[in-house]
């Protein structure tokens, strides 16, 4: 597993300018919920949406604004994820990145958008149904845990395998189950990175300002690295790239 981290760090540093350029899409995707008057809250450098408890009380205009904002946020998020995965594919398979960008970017982005949209809809439905039924909170997290394997590596499969949405979801669950250790490693690195930087920003400036600075930092530096790591892990399914 150590070489996965090594490949990720090397790819991140050697393509830092390109990564930072594409990370602007992550930043836009994260900022849209804030400026669209979402019922949101921030924690550990992330934006979280209060869905069921708030959406049921919205009027038509507010609801329409939120739906449109989610749509555009997912578009920017999809573009950024695809771009980072293209960098990984270029680094490890020596595919010409310009050809990939011009010929596959729109197709990949639309498929990844479909994956993210489906995941978002399912999360919202779970939240809404559990809120209405007054079910215990742990059931929501259990449902999220059950569907996550179908979505975790799906964006990587879309770009690396040129998969369609359903096939990408099948490949995602297949690889996650086969290499569950990679999934645990990714979670551990994400948790440690977010915790460390969150703590540092609180120490530097223990105010609401540090929360928004952390959001920007995560979007520009941390999130691209985690997507790159995820993509590098998925590439391990190819025997010729296991070294």
Language model: regions and residue ranges:
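Hydrophobic alpha-helical membrane segments
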Residues: 1-243
């Amino acid at each position: 597993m150590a070489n996965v981290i090594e490949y990720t760090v090397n790819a991140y540093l050697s393509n830092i300018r390109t990564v930072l350029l594409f990370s602007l899409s992550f930043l836009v995707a994260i900022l849209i919920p804030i400026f669209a008057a979402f019922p949101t809250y921030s924690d550990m450098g992330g934006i979280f949406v209060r869905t069921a408890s708030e959406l049921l009380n919205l009027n038509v205009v507010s609801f329409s604004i939120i739906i449109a904002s989610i749509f555009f946020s997912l578009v920017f998020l999809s573009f950024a994820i695809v771009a980072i995965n293209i960098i990984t594919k270029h680094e490890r398979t020596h595919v010409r990145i310009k050809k990939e960008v011009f010929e596959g970017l729109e197709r990949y982005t639309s498929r990844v958008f479909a994956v993210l949209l489906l995941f978002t809809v399912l999360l919202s439905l779970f939240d809404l149904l559990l809120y209405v039924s007054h079910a215990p909170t742990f059931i929501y997290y259990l449902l999220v845990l059950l569907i996550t394997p179908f979505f975790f590596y799906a964006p990587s499969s879309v770009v690396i395998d040129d998969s369609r949405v359903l096939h990408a979801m099948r490949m995602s669950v297949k690889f996650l189950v086969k290499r569950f250790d990679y999934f645990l490693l990714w979670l551990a690195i994400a948790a440690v990175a977010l915790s460390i930087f969150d703590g540092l920003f609180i120490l530097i400036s223990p105010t609401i300002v540090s929360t928004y600075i952390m959001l920007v930092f995560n979007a520009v530096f941390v999130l691209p690295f985690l997507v790159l790591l995820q993509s590098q892990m998925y590439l391990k399914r190819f025997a010729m790239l296991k070294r």
